[in-house]
């Protein structure tokens, strides 16, 4: 995962009018590689932390064991197939809010994911997101 949005205090506090908001899940939205998701804090609600699910090129993030678990849990065949193709984190489905999908620029996400980190999994050098484009996918 590539996580961001720590807020001005560096503690993940909310920037949305001082309020947290509940987790929203959908059977139509899954944690495929590139999914843009809101992190859940200790209260079980979302604040300002978000993350992108990543699966590095050549990395098998969805093992046969995970496929078997998804099948046993009743995942639809097309969802299992999409995970096998794209990679991702099916264990996060139905636990937090998926609200977008990176469809251009995963190479940048992969580069960030390979950055050196400290013992707390924080990058040893700060990484700043300077801009983001949010648009409706036309493909």
PLM features: what roles do these ranges have?
Residues 1-139:
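Cyclophilin-like peptidyl-prolyl cis-trans isomerases
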